Amino acid sequence: MDTFITRNFQTTIIQKAKNTMAEFSEDPELQPAMLFNICVHLEVCYVISDMNFLDEEGKTYTALEGQGKEQNLRPQYEVIEGMPRNIAWMVQRSLAQEHGIETPRYLADLFDYKTKRFIEVGITKGLADDYFWKKKEKLGNSMELMIFSYNQDYSLSNEHSLDEEGKGRVLSRLTELQAELSLKNLWQVLIGEEDIEKGIDFKLGQTISKLRDISVPAGFSNFEGMRSYIDNIDPKGAIERNLARMSPLVSVTPKKLKWEDLRPIGPHIYSHELPEVPYNAFLLMSDELGLANMTEGKSKKPKTLAKECLEKYSTLRDQTDPILIMKSEKANENFLWKLWRDCVNTISNEETSNELQKTNYAKWATGDGLTYQKIMKEVAIDDETMYQEEPKIPNKCRVAAWVQTEMNLLSTLTSKRALDLPEIGPDVAPVEHVGSERRKYFVNEINYCKASTVMMKYVLFHTSLLNESNASMGKYKVIPITNRVVNEKGESFDILYGLAVKGQSHLRGDTDVVTVVTFEFSSTDPRVDSGKWPKYTVFRIGSLFVSGREKSVYLYCRVNGTNKIQMKWGMEARRCLLQSMQQMEAIVDQESSIQGYDMTKACFKGDRVNSPKTFSIGTQEGKLVKGSFGKALRVIFTKCLMHYVFGNAQLEGFSAESRRLLLLIQALKDRKGPWVFDLEGMYSGIEECISNNPWVIQSAYWFNEWLGFEKEGSKVLESIDEIMDE
């Protein structure tokens, strides 16, 4: 943590933070988390002060607006935080006396010369609103409050006290610090600022003690008697006693479960009367087309990267006469095409900014002005035209072949790798050597898997999107969808998959939605599988020669939306690696414990004694298909990625409900003779979650296939048992 603080904060800020701790007899070496919190708090105060200025007439200027007028400007905010305590009190009293206002009881962080108000600044790991009211209760109206959270929300007592750019700067800095801390596994060590406030110990007086004794529930004479009862109470058996009282009201007949009682789940997924489940992932996956540009491997700004790729493929960039191939139900194809041309022009120009003009078609695409208006409950009751919206129940869909195709393509090996993993230090102990060897085998298999390229695209895009959403709340921004890959020869390529447009993003809550319009390149003709693309408007924008063959290039356009929770999950998509690797490592560990030596190499490649391990990874023409250990690893990794990409409430519910059914099947396989009641109720709970989520529907399809194989296997075992009995 000490190294992290030194690298991320200016020396003057660190020194002031240490001086502050010294005043309270705190040791920075013993309390590095406290030192970090004070440094962050100080830096935020300086960011706010450095961004806002006043002229001699009292007119406000941002740092950008004040360029060239520095001689006539002075800071709008006086920074009190960081001064020695006695000097800080003297400054606070002087400012209050000078401006004819009351001196607050508590020491403030800033003073606003424009509003003549003292300001308290707070940083929290929790919800900004919660911490705001905690501070408000303590400080009352003696000063203004500015609360910022690492969760990317904020709460201000005066909304006009800080402009959007100032809020964006603070929130972007907090995002950056959180990402750095998480990368170095220091985030969990950190405590919130609200956790380090000192309490005051005091003895209860006679009056308060009497009030406490009077306030105990009926049945207790005083507080100490109630405390003694709670300390000695035995909670065991309480649930059983309550259930026993309810038994006359409950009528349950347990039934021993047999294989014949189990049926396939979600029979509607086979109905041809229902539409095929449409593609609804945020970005294209196996259908993506990347415009590649060889590079030296140096880091670039996303706009520069996108500009260079578009310059190389100028025929696609300069296309002005597209052919409309497919149109979504609510789309305006003319507006979408105009917006695409604006995006290309913004990326291609010489300016450093990637801001879009707020044209009428940009406003249409981003839904500007279409948000719900909040009104008071009292107004709604009096207004007869106000009514509760009917809940939107998702339409049922049937299984589609494209989900299995996506799965197959994403789990294949390619000639390029995009996976960006941190380097690890040299091995010290023998167990570390085993871990390094195992990591090498696992990463080599995953590195060139198509799914890892898609995963990194999601990580990079959501990181850029969250940063732009925080830094430019009221602006429309063009965000390139990019990646960087390395081929087998070690050559680096910048890849441009398309462009996205971010609408206004005043995201105060985690579930507040920001509109994102995506424009992605593809060589897939949407008419081949039209049921897959009802959410997209598709243009043909030209062709490319690949390996001597001409391929049409299509532009897939979609108006979409996301929120901070989904963006943060997108940034953390690398976690898909952990799930798959841990699952396969458990198998290696089990084999190693049986054989008595490390079986990593044997599982992947085999050795003199053992042949390489194989697993059932799918079906073909009604028969199980076997695959290598590496293939199984890639399949599980791809499933983890799909679980993230298509994750929603349906998938959460399906995973939780179907787990019970899986446990019953496992008990039948182990011949434990499970008993059940209300089996149909459990099926109903599972099928309620099978609506229009592609991954849920495909999982139900695979489950039914697997159940069929298990039933066949059980019949074989039963016939063997009968022969043995005879």
From Swiss-Prot:
Write out the residues that bind Mn(2+) 2: 81, 109
Q: What is the name of this protein?
A: Polymerase acidic protein
A Pfam family that this protein carries is: Flu_PA
How the protein assembles, per its UniProt entry?
Influenza RNA polymerase is composed of three subunits: PB1, PB2 and PA. Interacts (via C-terminus) with PB1 (via N-terminus).
EC number of the protein: 3.1.-.-
- MF GO annotations: endonuclease activity; metal ion binding; RNA binding
The yes or no answer to whether the keyword Nuclease is present is yes
Q: Which UniProt keywords apply?
A: Cap snatching, Endonuclease, Eukaryotic host gene expression shutoff by virus, Eukaryotic host transcription shutoff by virus, Host cytoplasm, Host gene expression shutoff by virus, Host nucleus, Host-virus interaction, Hydrolase, Inhibition of host RNA polymerase II by virus, Manganese, Metal-binding, Nuclease, Phosphoprotein
In what way is this protein post-translationally modified? Answer: Phosphorylated on serines and threonines by host kinases, including human casein kinase II.
| Described purpose of this protein according to its UniProt entry | Plays an essential role in viral RNA transcription and replication by forming the heterotrimeric polymerase complex together with PB1 and PB2 subunits. The complex transcribes viral mRNAs by using a unique mechanism called cap-snatching. It consists in the hijacking and cleavage of host capped pre-mRNAs. These short capped RNAs are then used as primers for viral mRNAs. The PB2 subunit is responsible for the binding of the 5' cap of cellular pre-mRNAs which are subsequently cleaved after 10-13 nucleotides by the PA subunit that carries the endonuclease activity.
Q: Which organism is it from?
A: Influenza B virus (strain B/Ann Arbor/1/1966 [wild-type])
- Chain positions recorded as Mn(2+) 1 binding sites: 41, 109, 120-121
Enumerate the cofactors the protein uses: Mn(2+)
Q: Where in the cell is it found?
A: Host cytoplasm; Host nucleus
Q: Which InterPro entries match?
A: INFV_PA, PA/PA-X, PA/PA-X_sf
Q: Which family does it belong to?
A: Belongs to the influenza viruses PA family.
Alphabetical GO CC annotations of the entry are: host cell cytoplasm; host cell nucleus
Q: Mainly localized where?
A: host cell
Q: How is the cofactor bound?
A: Binds 2 manganese ions per subunit.
Motif Nuclear localization signal 1 (NLS1): list the residue ranges.
Answer: 125-140
The keyword Metal-binding is annotated on this UniProt entry = yes
HAMAP family assigned to the protein according to its UniProt record, in alphabetical order = INFV_PA
Listed GO biological process terms: cap snatching; DNA-templated transcription; symbiont-mediated suppression of host gene expression; symbiont-mediated suppression of host mRNA transcription via inhibition of RNA polymerase II activity; viral RNA genome replication; viral translational frameshifting
